[in-house]
Design a protein with these regions (language model features):
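Extracytoplasmic and endomembrane cell-envelope/extracellular-matrix remodeling and assembly machinery
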Residues: 224-265, 276-307
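Active-site His/Glu-centered metal-binding helix of metallohydrolases
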Residues: 141, 150-159, 203, 207
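Alpha-helical membrane-targeting segments
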Residues: 53-72, 167-193, 250-264
Length: 353
């Protein structure tokens, strides 16, 4: 046993974590009227609240949607995909319906499968959210693991992430192609969005866990998505030992996020996500939710000050700097877009973009 190996049956063992006995849909609790606040990470909630509170930032995003339009965006995402239904990908459809029921989502959002070996999924849209599932994910994961991924994406929808995630995807594509409006200002917005985007993944990991109600399933899915191996080739307990190494230093997680900013990564490392999710479980919040102790949809939402207060314990200075950078970059980006539009209209024979 190495210094990171968990003792058998101890707190680091997946078998000992709360909720382990809830594997399999027959025994899962339906979380009636559960509010997304139940699973949202304080840093994600505060950052998103801050983004929504900056009018110029939201204006920039909606102007981009005005330029491209929601329908063309939907078609672009769905052009090479198949919509899931009882007759198309019936296995995926059945698993998805169970997730919708467990999380008591208001409705089943359109779900598509796209042919690509890359193991991934995403939730996109503006007023009409939809979920896109890569075929590589469908092939790699077993039923429970796939339900974790589906619940994760439903969590993004219910938390109101899809508008910003869609804009993130568009801006990344524009940046890669050197589109005229994507200069330093837009890249500043990208950095700010990336910071929130990664925090939002931590929230949806919690939603994914609530959708399957078995930590072992989540850790196994993350392990497969990190390494691509089969159950015979990998061992969950050793993967958890990797995650334990990330908890040896209080400052390491923040350092990892800073490195990811430099690398331009959209997702935190899976080992870091395992560590974050285990920390949340150990607070008792997960068990309380399964006992029915959670905020309901329709309950009064906490105020802005309270939202910031939750995050301030570990995130206050970082969040303040984050919002300031977003506000400054968004103003510059707005001016850049408007100037580009004016230049397009002023050119003879050109009707704008």
């Amino acid at each position: 046993m190495t210094e990171h190996d968990p003792p058998p049956g101890g707190p680091s063992s997946p078998e000992s974590l709360p909720g382990g006995e809830n594997a399999g849909s027959p025994s899962r609790k339906i979380l009636e009227d559960i509010s997304s606040r139940s699973w949202e990470h304080p840093a994600d909630r505060a950052a998103l609240h801050g983004l929504r509170g900056i009018p110029v930032f939201d204006e920039v995003l909606r102007k981009l949607f005005g330029i491209f339009g929601e329908k063309p965006i939907r078609l672009a995402f769905q052009a090479n995909s198949v919509e899931v239904s009882p007759r198309q990908f019936p296995r995926v459809h059945r698993l998805y319906e169970e997730v919708i029921q467990t999380l008591d989502a208001p409705k089943a959002y359109p779900l598509f499968v796209s042919q690509t070996p890359v193991v991934n999924a995403g939730a996109y849209g503006m007023e009409r959210p939809f979920i896109l599932l890569n075929s590589g994910t469908v092939r790699l994961l077993d039923d429970d693991e796939l339900q974790y991924v589906l619940a994760h994406e439903v969590g993004h929808v219910l938390s109101g992430h899809v508008l910003y995630r869609t804009m993130m995807a568009i801006l990344l594509q524009l940046a890669d192609r050197g589109f005229p409006i994507v200069g330093l200002a837009a890249r500043g917005v990208l950095v700010a969005l990336l910071e929130w985007y990664r925090r939002s993944e931590l929230s949806s990991d919690r939603a994914g866990l609530l959708g399957v109600q078995d930590p072992k399933v989540v850790f196994r899915a993350m392990m497969k998505m990190a390494g691509g191996g089969t159950a015979e080739e990998t061992e969950v307990s050793e993967f958890i030992s990797q995650a334990e190494a990330y908890r040896e230093s209080e400052d390491l997680a923040d350092s990892v996020f800073k490195v990811l900013n430099i690398l331009g990564s959209t997702h935190p490392f899976y080992v870091l996500r395992v560590s974050e999710l285990r920390s949340w479980i150990e607070t008792g919040a997960y068990d309380r939710i399964l006992r029915g102790e959670y905020p309901r949809r329709g309950d009064p939402a906490p105020g802005y000050v309270e939202e910031l207060g939750d995050a301030a314990k570990s995130y206050e200075a970082e969040f303040r700097e984050f919002v300031d950078e977003v506000a400054s970059a968004a103003r510059k980006m707005r001016d850049s877009i408007l100037e580009s539009l004016r230049e397009g209209k002023d050119r003879p024979g050109r009707g704008g973009w």
